[in-house]
Amino acid sequence: DRWHRVMGEAVVLPTLGAQLKRRTLEWEGLEEPPTVGHGNDPGGEGPFQQGGEAEAHRYLQSFFAGRVKGYRRNIGQPLASRRTCSRLSPYLAWGCLSMRQVFHAFRQAPKQGATHDLRAFGSRLRWQGHFIQKFESEDRMEFEPVNRAYLEQGHTGTPESLRAWKEGRTGVPLVDACMRCVIATGYLNFRMRAMLVSFLTHHLDHPWDAGVEHLARCFLDFEPGIHYAQFQMQAAVTGINTIRIYNPVKQGLERDAEGAFVRHWVPEIAHLQAPEIHHPWTIPPMQR
């Protein structure tokens, strides 16, 4: 179709004349220029990924060279996905890579042992373009629900529960681990992002726009065209999409079976074993 045809066209590279001089910024009042937080290998639990085109290509190459194997299997797991997902979204959002560059690398990637993983990844490249184009024609979704009937919906969420959600201290282990993780690193896999929105809107009963800006500030890969549409879909205010209510305990048992992710980000309960670490309130007082 047209998307594949356009993405398959040659990558246009700028022609830089020899007369172009390198320019540097003057850091007034500073002995040393500020540095970007030190990056880490894909899958690490350190600070934010480093910016820049060179880092973008390092992630691009390492993904198709081997990390892609396991992409489909691990995409829903908060810990394993940190390595087997591409981690290219920040570089696309900030313009360090173009979608066409990624698409060309995808088409040239070796298929051996990764056919299904590559197919799953390729489908998501197209969805990225779909949501951005949709936002261009319906940009009001930044401010109001797609289905305006939800403007009249009442909510019972309290300021205290909203604050607890934003700070990662709701008392629900996987929810708190996910929020603390995204605050500290700027990254979280899709399913866990969806669960955070679901928990805010369905379990705590807050309107979708109570948390949309908070997560936008947290995401290193914030992309308006994707963020607002996905937030509304998970909050079930589009009126056309299936309503999905994520059970955070079930998600923890299925996606973080040994509790390693929760144990890392919620050290207060790191001493607990699985499966109790995902529902500590069920532990009898004598065993706590």
What do the predicted segments below correspond to?
Residues 1-149, 255-256, 260-288:
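Glycine/tryptophan-enriched, flexible segments
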Residues 84-275:
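Active-site-proximal binding-pocket segments
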